Amino acid sequence: MAKFDAHLKCSFCGKSQEQVRKLIAGPGVYICDECIDLCNEILDEELVDGQAGARQGQGDASRKQAAPRKPSKPAPTLATIPKPQEIKAHLDEQVVGQNDAKKVLSVAVYNHYKRLAWQGDGSTEPESSATRLHKSNILLIGPTGCGKTLLAQTLAEMMEVPFAVADATTLTEAGYVGEDVENILLRLLQKADGDVEQAQRGIIYIDEIDKIARKSENPSITRDVSGEGVQQALLKMLEGTVANVPPQGGRKHPYQDCIQIDTSQILFICGGAFVGLDDVIQRRMGRNAIGFVPGETRNGRSRQKDQEASQVLRNLEPDDLVKYGLIPEFIGRIPVSAVLEPLDEQALEAILTEPRDALVKQFQTLLSMDSVRLEFQPEAVRAIAREAHRRKTGARALRGIIEDLMLDLMYDLPSQNEVQKFVITEELVDECHGNKVLPHPSSLEQQSA
């Protein structure tokens, strides 16, 4: 047995038992004390490098904080908060239509910042008062391109507070691949240039909130990390809590000090299209309809269906959202809801010309830099709105249509100094999109007939 032990050697460095002080045996392998010391040195070096990187990141963050920053805007007071009618008037300058939604938003935003002014830093609220004012987050329901994000952004600009947009489809429950809900607060903090106090008075718009609905009303057996799991993770943030926000993102930089943000003063606005929610409401109201629509009336019926859907959504109840896939706890933290109308052709025409930053005005400004005066005939504006309405993507389709229309013009005009004026006609719009847009199915049926 002693003769057999004399041939033992380290499985890593190959040294025999006589050449080392200690040889530790494992299942089929051996390691000497020298290799163990070497492994410990490697681990210590990696730990030191990781801590040094973390200290460097903290130093960069502290240098950014030490850099001169814009002075924080003063907290709102009851005298400086715009009244609901003033808020709606400002929204009218930027957003066409949606009067009911504007009214709901104006009152909700006014009450929210009036609550912040009432609480203040603790000195504004009377000590004898036992009344605590809780915030009311907002839910916007409307089809794509109807102005949900623009409304929230315009509100933030008017109130002069930081504004951040988050996409609910990228969020996952903590511990899974995707973004943590704390990253939403990190974006708001970045918009506030690292000013925590200013960020705590900001507005966060969470888009595509309907995409985190669970697949069925009944609790799932398997874990839904991007649906119900995200709703559960958002509960405390929506209600109000002190969240720990990693300034460099929590997953790639574990060695960093977190910044604490109180979300009780942040206004959350959630928006989504909620496709199929009108069917849920109609089933509750017992208004199901089954039938076939002739091809020649399909376009008119489609427009009528959009209008009917918006009217049905006005009968929305919390139980309908539960059946759609939102958990009751989540719905309870968004008590204010507003339904946005789908945009018709008249609204799209107004969007092209009326707002302060209307698309027609934007392209006129672009060409004026080349000393060219651009004009849109009313018939051309109507044709652009008609094409955008046919695409069913709301106001977002308008820019794509005009970009296609203006491509050759913006390519040639800078090199043609003799051109001083250009007029967009209806014929030019039809010619531009006649070969690029598929005809409506009803027209195909008429041609085949």
Curated annotation (Swiss-Prot):
Protein name: ATP-dependent Clp protease ATP-binding subunit ClpX
Top-level taxon: Bacteria
Binding site for Zn(2+): C10, C13, C32, C35
Record flagged with keyword Chaperone: yes
InterPro entries: AAA+_ATPase, ATP-dep_Clp_protease_ClpX, ATPase_AAA_core, Clp_ATPase_C, Clp_protease_ATP-bd_su_ClpX, ClpX_bact, P-loop_NTPase, Znf_CppX_C4
Pfam families: AAA_2, ClpB_D2-small, zf-C4_ClpX
CDD domains listed in its UniProt record: RecA-like_ClpX (cd19497)
UniProt subunit comment: Component of the ClpX-ClpP complex. Forms a hexameric ring that, in the presence of ATP, binds to fourteen ClpP subunits assembled into a disk-like structure with a central cavity, resembling the structure of eukaryotic proteasomes.
GO CC field: HslUV protease complex
Presence of keyword Nucleus: no
Role, per record: ATP-dependent specificity component of the Clp protease. It directs the protease to specific substrates. Can perform chaperone functions in the absence of ClpP.
Family, as annotated: Belongs to the ClpX chaperone family.
Domain ClpX-type ZB positions: 1-51
Keywords: ATP-binding, Chaperone, Metal-binding, Nucleotide-binding, Zinc
Gene Ontology biological process: cell division; proteolysis involved in protein catabolic process
Primary gene name: clpX
Record region (Disordered): 53-79
PANTHER family: ATP-DEPENDENT CLP PROTEASE ATP-BINDING SUBUNIT CLPX-LIKE, MITOCHONDRIAL, ATP-DEPENDENT CLP PROTEASE ATP-BINDING SUBUNIT CLPX-LIKE, MITOCHONDRIAL-RELATED
Residue positions binding ATP: P143, T144, G145, C146, G147, K148, T149, L150
